[in-house]
Regions:
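Positively charged n-region of N-terminal signal peptides that target proteins for export
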Residues: 1-5
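Signal peptide processing junction and immediate N-terminal pro/mature segment
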Residues: 18-22
Length: 549
């Protein structure tokens, strides 16, 4: 053991409680509420009884035809032009994400209509080409985008009911082609328990909401392009060397929240980054709730602290890539929650503790770590809110599609289990790495998420691997809440985080990804069983063991 840092501070926080009991009344969740939570992360530990789900065009046969399996198409009649219903759900709730596969002139006649609270007039009624337009549409870039895939992450809250449908005047007439609906539709939404008050979206937004929209768009642009500001003074800043088998241990006493953490490891080789284990224990519990190799927590296990690579799968910048040329990219990346620079990796996951915390970094590799630097910023609190969970990170690694692999769906497709837990908590994201030294595609598998449920199908069923990472068509781009570290060939490493659309659970959660490649990729998965590695980020109360491999 190299060092042990005791807590050096104690800050008293005075809580002013209104005499009228207003502290028991949560704020109404309106557009500004959801926008603010798209650019901040301090709310992530909050647990509640909401339920996040998805309505999509996933293939109900269990195959890979996920583009056009529409679930509720109303045929035209003499009195009605017909419609394609994408979502029909009761409130209170909020739509967080709407994705579509392609936008071409073939879809020019298709309109999207969104009705709130059983209103006779839709709040949005416009061509889908306009709805997803990141220059002249209703939402600003980067809250709407068409990088590798058209979509919007603009919140649409509703109090009582929400209906999302497609209409087209040519539907049912001679020459009609279902391709006019487009394909690979996904609508992600959350429903809240009845005590939660949600104010339905009003359009156009008022001046205050316009400021919130602009602030959120700017915050996302900054989050995807630069690292967060450092605190005026770090709570702890330690540097040491670590021989194989040795550890750095940092102890914190009392109550607080780790707001930011930065780690630098030299040499930043795959052996060292995969062999350096980070463990965090909360509130005096002996078993770690965070138990992950440093390189797989931050995603740079195979790429180090910012190196250059080339791939046909990289989409950089605002506009979609045309064709498939090789693109040079750096594995240094930035996001709202994690990032890697040329010198270090950083995390902004809030990590609360009520009765101390112990962070251990152990060198399990066979090489000497010449320099390990750890810095973190802690905010002291008098006590934690009762509804806060503790941060957890679970790392697992296994070969794909073996006899021991779990399987789901009508065709028993093998899956990688990212997280499977019982209790009360909240799943907020993943870092995924696939061992893939090939140019061809690896990710036709759908993401499936069960929360407080066990039957088939799950309430969240995606349409492919890359869509879960807000990307598409076998390529990846970078956003504030999702993106890539590395791409094929090599060790494609991609991440996705959930803010408003986090998956709360009261009894259990299961997160899996189908292992399906398509064409030569399918043969590789079935015959060579490449490694699938994941780090799941989640919160829980009470504290649980990470359960890592």
């Amino acid at each position: 053991m190299i060092g042990r840092l005791a807590a050096l501070w104690l800050t008293l926080v005075v809580l002013v409680v209104p005499a009228n009991g207003a502290q028991d009344q949560p704020p109404e969740r309106d557009l500004s509420f959801f926008l603010h939570r798209l650019r901040t992360v301090d709310h992530l530990p909050e647990l509640e009884a909401s339920h996040t789900a998805m309505s999509s065009t996933w293939d109900r046969s269990g195959g890979n035809a996920d583009g056009t399996d529409f679930k509720n198409v109303v045929q035209p009649t003499a009195r009605s032009p017909g419609r394609n219903i994408l979502l029909d759900t009761a409130g209170p709730g909020c739509i967080h994400r709407i994705f579509v596969g392609v936008l071409t002139e073939r879809q020019a006649g298709t309109r999207i209509q969104i009705f709130l609270d059983h209103g006779q007039k839709p709040i949005f009624d416009m061509p889908i080409l306009e709805f997803f337009n990141d220059s002249n549409g209703p939402f600003p870039y980067p809250l709407v985008f068409h990088k590798s895939y058209p979509g919007t992450l603009f919140p649409i809250p509703f109090a009582k009911h929400c209906l999302v449908q497609l209409v087209n005047d040519r539907f049912g007439k001679p020459g009609w082609n279902d391709a006019a609906w487009s394909n690979y539709w996904q609508v992600t939404y959350t429903r809240y328990p009845d005590p939660v008050k949600v104010k339905s979206l009003v359009w156009p937004p008022d001046d205050g909401e316009k400021k919130e929209i602009a602030a959120t768009a700017q915050a996302w642009l900054e989050a995807e392009s630069k690292q967060p500001n450092e605190p005026a003074k770090w709570t702890a800043d330690q540097t040491t060397a670590l021989e194989p088998g040795k550890s750095m241990v940092v102890d914190l006493a009392g109550v607080g929240v780790i707001r930011q953490m930065r780690i630098s490891v030299e040499p930043d080789t795959p052996e060292v980054l995969r062999g350096t284990r980070m463990q965090i224990r909360w509130d005096g519990i002996d078993t770690p709730s965070v138990d992950v190799p440093v390189g797989h927590f931050f995603g740079h296990a195979y790429s180090g602290q910012g190196r250059w690579f080339t791939s046909t799968a990289a989409v950089l910048g605002k506009k979609p890539l045309k064709g498939g040329p090789y693109v040079d990219y750096t594995s240094a990346y930035n996001s709202l929650l994690l990032g890697v620079t040329s010198k270090e990796a950083y995390s902004r996951f809030p990590m609360p503790f009520a009765n101390g915390a112990t962070l251990t970094i152990r060198n399990r590799s066979g090489s000497r770590i010449g320099k390990l630097r750890l810095r973190f910023d802690v905010e002291r609190l008098a006590q934690l809110p009762a509804n806060w969970g503790r941060f957890h990170a679970t790392w697992t690694e296994s070969p794909a599609a073996t006899d021991k692999s779990p399987a789901t769906g009508p065709k028993n497709v093998p899956v990688k289990t990212v997280l499977q837990k019982e209790g009360r908590g909240k799943y907020v994201g993943v870092m995924l790495t696939v061992d893939w030294p090939y140019e061809f595609w690896w990710g036709e598998g759908d993401w499936q998420i069960w929360t407080d449920e066990s039957g088939w199908p799950p309430s969240y069923h995606g349409t492919g691997s890359e869509e879960y990472f807000n990307s598409g068509w076998c390529r990846f781009d970078r956003k504030a809440v999702s993106g890539f570290v590395m791409l094929r060939p090599g060790h494609p490493t991609v991440y996705s985080f959930h803010l408003n659309d986090a998956f709360q659970f009261q009894r259990n959660v299961r997160v899996v990804e189908e292992q399906m490649g398509g064409g030569p990729g399918e043969r590789v998965i079935r015959e060579r069983h490449p490694l699938w590695t994941s780090t799941a980020y989640w919160y829980a109360n009470p504290v649980q063991p990470a359960g890592s491999d």
